[in-house]
């Protein structure tokens, strides 16, 4: 700040207050005095801020109130825990082709203003991903109607009908920034599992924390077996355990089936996250 003041007074960016002088009104050459001040504030670093409110000694009865009409803030509800049953009758929401980063899954830009409102920001879910079946973005088939619509709209339709869905992806799915919304949005819109050729590590962990199944093909060529109208059944999710593959059955529109083996990297604690519905759910259960 002292240098800024000296430069401003002299009107020169190259002014050196140690060696240079200023010309007074009477023509006298003068130097600026060396600035002086207290090394430490006399009253310490405590700032009396009228905006500060001390927390309640007992926070058990404190409620955070958010305007229900706000489009930027929304209280989060805990995700539902696993019911202990195999996931059956799931629909393929999208089979993403090629690169699918966290920005393809949950775009930034103007969407960032909705970061505090999970339902609103979920309207950007996977809108940048390329659908392998038509090579278009944000255009997927709603198996309930046969019509094509935006990815979030189809996901919402499945969720409203009580139909689970899965996302299929390519190599290094979820690369890029560690964007938590890229895992929270599919979870919120009823996606139960993400099955890919390979994951970006942080996104895989984020899926686990939100109580989702992050799975990889045991045989990457099985990616090509998954068809647009497939219905997916998990055959042995009730035996979910560390190091044990999961078996998925893909039932095609003509009634034929393909059985696909999926790998995972879940340890015992992370399986606990899945069963509880999320890592936060499990922490809350343990605290109570």
Model-derived features: positions:
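Thiamine diphosphate
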Residues: 1, 6, 204-258, 262-264
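Short coil/turn connectors at secondary-structure junctions
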Residues: 1, 18, 26-28, 87-91, ...
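Conserved phosphate/anionic-ligand binding catalytic regions in large, soluble enzymes, centered on
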Residues: 1-16, 93-111, 172-185, 266-283
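Mobile "lid/hinge" segments at catalytic clefts and subdomain interfaces of large enzymes
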Residues: 1-52, 208, 240-244
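Acidic, Ser/Thr-rich low-complexity intrinsically disordered segments
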Residues: 28-82
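Non-catalytic terminal/interface segments that mediate subunit docking, oligomerization
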Residues: 59-195
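Long, charged alpha-helical interface segments
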Residues: 66, 245-253, 258-288
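Short hydrophobic alpha-helical runs that function as membrane-insertion/retention elements
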Residues: 192-197, 214-217
């Amino acid at each position: 700040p002292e240098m800024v003041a000296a430069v401003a007074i002299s009107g020169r960016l190259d002014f050196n207050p140690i060696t240079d002088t200023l010309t007074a009104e009477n023509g006298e050459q003068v130097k600026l005095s060396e600035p002086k001040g207290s090394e430490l504030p006399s009253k310490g670093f405590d700032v009396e801020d009228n905006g500060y409110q001390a927390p309640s000694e007992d926070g058990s009865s404190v409620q955070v109130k958010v305007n229900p009409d706000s489009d930027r803030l929304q209280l989060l509800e805990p995700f539902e825990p696993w019911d202990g049953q195999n996931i059956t009758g799931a629909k393929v929401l999208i089979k993403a082709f090629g690169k699918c980063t966290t920005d393809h899954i949950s775009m930034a830009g103007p969407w960032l203003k909705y970061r505090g409102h999970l339902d609103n920001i979920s309207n950007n879910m996977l809108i940048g991903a390329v659908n392998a079946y038509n090579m278009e973005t944000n255009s997927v088939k709603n198996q309930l109607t046969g019509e094509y619509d935006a990815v979030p709209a189809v996901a919402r339709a499945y969720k409203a009908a009580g139909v689970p869905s899965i996302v299929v992806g390519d190599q290094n799915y979820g690369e890029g920034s560690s964007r938590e919304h890229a895992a929270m949005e599919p979870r919120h819109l009823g996606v139960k599992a993400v099955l890919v050729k390979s994951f970006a590590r942080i996104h895989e962990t984020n899926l686990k924390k939100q109580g989702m199944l992050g799975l990889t093909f045991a045989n990457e060529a099985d990616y090509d077996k998954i068809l647009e109208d497939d219905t997916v059944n998990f055959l042995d999710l009730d035996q979910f355990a560390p190091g044990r593959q999961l078996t998925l059955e893909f039932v095609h529109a003509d009634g034929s089936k393909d059985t696909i083996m999926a790998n995972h990297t879940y340890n015992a604690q992370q399986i606990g996250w899945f069963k509880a519905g999320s890592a936060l759910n499990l922490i809350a259960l343990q605290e109570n």
